[in-house]
């Protein structure tokens, strides 16, 4: 039995490029829709929380944030099941990105559980922690995916979210009145930057590729 020849530097780069292209193709099949779904869901729930909190002046309005995982997880699974990416073998890049988002999801439940426990202890204001999670953790995850797949819209969107999170965190520490004015608008803007804008760009690129393929087959 012959020993396998080690890969050259060029072959390694070609393999990595092929995995990235293959993962990008899967993003064009399903993640355009998933990005749009999560982005618009987050924005809708944020507006709902904002409105309820404004009219009731109650911090318990933050419990409405649970609508995001309660609605989002089953619907996103349904969208993934219906996606056209079935039948493709998962590459290392796919598994790495999937594992990263699972870890991000685990952190969201861990953070939410901490907030819930402190809320029952009479400190409902701790739900602000979920803002920092969304800005910083999700922003970092989005930026990493943008770097891995060379999606500049996701890289810039994640970067915007991280910077917005740094502003909100600083305003919280400084007890600045800017927090009440800018926290929710920045959250909504960050969701649009991370999910809605990249989702529309990916969806438009998918349609353009499909039209070019149809024209080429004709």
Predicted regions and their residues:
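C-terminal ends of transmembrane helices
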Residues: 22, 76-94, 140-149, 196-203
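Selected alpha-helical membrane-embedding segments in polytopic membrane proteins
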Residues: 28-114
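Terminal transmembrane helical module of multi-pass membrane proteins
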Residues: 142-218
């Amino acid at each position: 039995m012959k020993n396998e020849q080690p890969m050259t530097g060029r072959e390694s780069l070609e393999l990595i490029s092929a995995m990235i292209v293959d993962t990008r193709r899967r993003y064009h099949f399903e993640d355009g829709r998933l990005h749009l779904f999560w982005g618009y869901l987050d924005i809708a729930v944020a507006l709902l929380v904002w409105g309820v909190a404004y009219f009731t002046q109650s911090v318990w309005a933050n419990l409405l944030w649970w609508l995001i995982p309660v609605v989002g997880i089953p619907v996103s699974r349904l969208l993934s099941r219906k996606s056209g990416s079935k039948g493709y073998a998962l590459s290392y890049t796919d598994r790495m990105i999937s594992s990263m988002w699972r870890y991000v999801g685990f952190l969201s439940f861990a953070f939410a559980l901490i907030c819930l426990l402190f809320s029952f202890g009479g400190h409902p204001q701790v739900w602000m922690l979920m803002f920092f999670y969304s800005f910083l953790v999700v922003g970092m995850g989005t930026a990493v995916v943008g770097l891995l797949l060379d999606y500049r819209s996701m890289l810039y969107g994640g970067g915007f979210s991280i910077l917005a999170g740094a502003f909100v965190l600083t305003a919280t520490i400084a007890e600045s009145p800017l927090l009440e004015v800018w926290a929710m608008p920045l959250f909504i803007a960050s969701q649009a930057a991370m999910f809605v804008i990249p989702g529309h760009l990916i969806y438009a690129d998918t349609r353009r590729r499909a039209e070019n393929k149809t024209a080429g087959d004709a």
